[in-house]
Design a protein with these regions (language model features):
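N-terminal hydrophobic or amphipathic helices and topogenic motifs
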Residues: 2-5, 14-54, 63, 259, ...
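Short glycine-centered helix-capping/turn motifs at secondary-structure transition points
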Residues: 46, 71, 168-171, 190, ...
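Short, glycine-/small- and polar/acidic-enriched structural segments
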Residues: 22-147, 153, 174, 180, ...
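Secondary-structure end/capping motifs
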Residues: 217-292
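Pocket-lining segment of extracytoplasmic ligand-binding domains
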Residues: 81, 150, 154-245
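Sec/Tat-exported extracytoplasmic proteins
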Residues: 72, 77, 87, 142-145, ...
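Proline/Glycine/Serine-rich low-complexity intrinsically disordered segments
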Residues: 113-119, 136-137, 142-143, 149-152, ...
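Extracytoplasmic/secreted proteins, especially bacterial periplasmic and envelope-associated proteins
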Residues: 37, 43, 63, 67, ...
Length: 293
């Protein structure tokens, strides 16, 4: 028997559903985090249009969360931190699709070394998205190196603003909590990585798609197709990263292909197989996986 390709199965699945099955648009809010780029690839290939799925772009993790709270999206992409915040308000929110695990993609940068920051009494200007996983990373940094939190001036900015910071005052102590691809511009401005989820921060950061149980039931077929085309997009990335980048580069401008490839090394795709060790860590973090597609 001939082997049926994944693409052919997806086409049969889509064609087997009447257009009326997808009359209502499924809106998903998403940032330009490298782990979510398969969604943009699927959009550019027209796969999302076929099942009436629309991406709503957000400039930050916190804005992404606010879009969902305001009813401007039916599902949102984010970390387990944003999930835990929203779950307090809406207990029926569930993770339904996994993208990646940060393995260096979330990081802390500075214009001073950790030793200099630790041994100083000067104030520290800390730039971050406060209502996001950024805050957890900064708190971990403060605790790990016994830094007096009274020295910290918390400055809430979205990542597009943060990435435009310039290292023009060498005496001023600046700490920046960011994530790929925004770290690239900061590196060019003279800031250096001092900690990351690969080096020094033992934090589990999972990127997933979340929605309410009722919404999942209502749009179940669309979510299932979304899962299939996202997996297909990740395979396309692994098979031909240049073609993938050229397809979605407008969303990442001004990131270069080389910088994009560097960023990919700082995440681990978990869309298909979950190692048992990771499942254990997720359970300890109270992250449910029973509804994951």
């Amino acid at each position: 028997m001939k082997k049926i390709s994944l693409s052919f199965i997806i086409i049969l699945f889509i064609c087997g559903c009447s257009k009326s099955d997808y009359d209502e648009t499924l809106k998903i809010s998403v940032t330009t985090w490298v782990g979510y780029t398969p969604l943009y690839y699927a959009k550019e290939k027209g796969w999302l249009d076929e099942v009436n799925i629309k991406l709503v772009n957000a400039v930050s993790l916190s804005e992404n969360m606010y879009l969902y709270q305001a009813g401007n999206s039916d599902a949102f992409c984010g970390t387990q931190y944003e999930y835990s915040v929203l779950k307090l308000q809406s207990p029926d929110i569930i993770p339904i699709m996994l993208f990646d695990r940060s393995n260096g993609g979330d990081l802390i940068m500075s214009n001073h070394s950790i030793t200099e920051l630790k041994n100083s009494n000067a104030d520290i200007q800390a730039y971050l998205e406060i209502d996001s996983i950024n805050y957890i990373l900064l708190e971990d940094f403060i605790k790990k190196f016994s830094i007096d939190e009274q020295r910290i001036n918390f400055i809430n900015r979205d990542q597009s603003e943060i990435s435009s910071l310039k290292n023009t005052h060498s005496k001023e102590q600046i700490v920046i909590v960011t994530y790929i691809p925004f770290n690239t511009a900061l590196e060019k401005s003279g800031f250096k990585e001092i900690l990351s989820t690969k080096r020094g921060l033992d934090l589990l950061v999972i990127d997933s798609l979340y929605t309410q149980k009722e919404t999942f039931i209502k749009h179940e077929q669309q979510f299932k197709v979304l899962k299939k085309v996202t997996d297909k997009a990740i395979k396309a990335l692994q098979n031909n990263p240049l073609e993938f980048f050229q397809t979605i580069k407008n969303y990442l401008d001004p990131l270069s292909y080389a910088e994009f490839n560097t960023g990919l090394k700082d995440i681990i795709w978990i869309n298909e197989d979950l190692p048992e060790s990771l499942k254990i860590r997720m359970r300890k973090a109270s992250f449910p996986i029973k509804d994951i597609l």
